Design a protein with these regions (language model features):
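Exposed, low-structure sequence patches enriched in small/polar residues
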Residues: 1-186
Length: 186
């Protein structure tokens, strides 16, 4: 598999870590970040079984709401351009643990939906104690409010649907299906 990624973040300032240039990190998420990535699978190259092309584009931004906290927003879209078996299709990132995982769907089952083209969004509002700090006796706990809203909408073309074109495709596991016309929201 070969891959390339372009990243554009106007106004971002990177800082060196302990290992010098090889450990750059960003202290601020105020600058918008735009990414374009492409992965290519090559059949018969380094043991590759399939030719495929997968493209993703994303935009990420932190929106400050003064003393009311901030919203982290991420919008992503992607497409698989070729006929591929289901392990190479797009499956939304799911969270099966009890901890909060960024950019993951907490209520969706693993392998519930597959698609070869999709758009998703993740909005997380960090209220920084705006409500809980006003409740007497609770402020000393330093609890913070986090509200998230996420969505995923994808489609599966006929060439990648084993129910319509079974030649060369694996059947979906039980409980896995293409998305219908309704987006998934949580």
């Amino acid at each position: 598999e070969l891959g390339a990624q372009l990243r554009f973040a106007p106004g971002e300032r990177a800082y060196n870590g302990r290992e010098g240039k090889n450990s750059l990190f960003n202290l601020s998420k105020d600058a918008p970040v735009f990414k374009l990535s492409h992965q290519m699978g090559l059949k018969n190259v380094l043991g590759g079984d399939f030719n495929y092309n997968h493209t993703e584009i994303s935009a990420e931004k932190r929106i400050w709401l003064s003393s009311f906290g901030h919203i982290d927003a991420l919008v992503t879209a992607g497409k698989v351009w070729d006929k591929v078996p289901f392990p190479l299709l797009i499956m939304p990132n799911t969270n099966q643990s009890i901890t909060i995982q960024p950019q993951a769907f907490n209520m969706m089952r693993a392998l519930e939906f597959v698609s070869d083209q999709y758009v998703s969004f993740y909005f997380t509002y960090y209220m920084k104690g705006w409500i809980l700090n006003r409740i007497p006796g609770v402020k000393w706990l330093r609890l913070r409010e986090v509200i998230s809203f996420s969505g995923f909408y994808g489609g599966l073309t006929d060439k990648n649907n084993p129910a319509l074109d079974p030649t060369g495709l694996y059947r979906f596991p039980e409980g896995t299906s293409p998305m219908g016309r309704t987006p998934y929201l949580e």
